[in-house]
Regions:
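Non-catalytic membrane-proximal stalk/linker segments that position and tether the catalytic domains
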Residues: 1-11
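Active-site and donor-binding regions of nucleotide-sugar-utilizing enzymes
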Residues: 10-186
Length: 187
């Protein structure tokens, strides 16, 4: 709010690793990108893959084609494979960061929610639709991510109530839930 009053753009970053779930954020990206009050960036990153004998207990990352998929959006490559170095998100001075998925275990330390939340507000739009009772909501609301977010965008009033119940169970009371629909169905 203060930035727009001072004619400063609001910096929003989409941290993306999985082209298959982009439709859950695509319309959100489009709306923000077309609004002159926002400076929107996509940072394409690789993801940890489960390895035999190690599971996810390692620091090896593999691309799911993110860099190529978001190239037409002018994405920033978040990982230099030759130097094995991560792009510093802080260089973009983010006000808000959207993650495609809520799984800290699959990201490098610098991109884990507890580190990003120190300098930006984390927003989350679920990548999967919860058909009541199918267990998706419980799977996609890990406590170690939920405690760091500022905004959780829910698909309907029932979903909003269920998310608030999960937040109460986790003893988290500072996340704002907002009913917005399910962006994957916007098109």
């Amino acid at each position: 709010k203060f930035k727009t009053l001072n004619n400063e753009k609001i910096n929003v970053i989409f941290v993306c690793h999985r082209p298959a779930v982009w439709e859950s954020l695509h319309s959100v990206y489009d709306v923000l990108n077309q609004d002159e009050d926002f400076n929107v960036s996509i940072v394409a990153i690789p993801n940890k893959k489960e390895l035999p004998d190690l599971g996810l207990n390692h620091e090896e990352y593999e691309s799911e084609g993110a860099e190529e998929f978001w190239k037409e959006y002018g994405c920033i490559n978040g990982y230099d494979y030759e130097k094995r170095e991560w792009f510093d998100l802080k260089k973009l001075n983010p006000d808000y960061v959207f993650f495609q998925q809520p799984y800290n275990i699959t990201r490098c330390e610098e991109y884990k929610s507890w580190n990003v939340a120190q300098y930006a507000k984390i927003c989350y739009v679920p990548y999967a639709y919860d058909f009541i009772g199918n267990g998706v909501l419980e799977e996609t609301t890990p406590k170690d991510f939920m405690c760091d977010i500022s905004f959780y965008f829910t698909q309907n009033n029932i979903d909003d109530h269920m998310v608030r119940d999960i937040l109460k169970k986790y003893l988290i009371d500072d996340v704002k839930t907002v009913v917005t629909g399910f962006p994957r169905y916007d098109n």
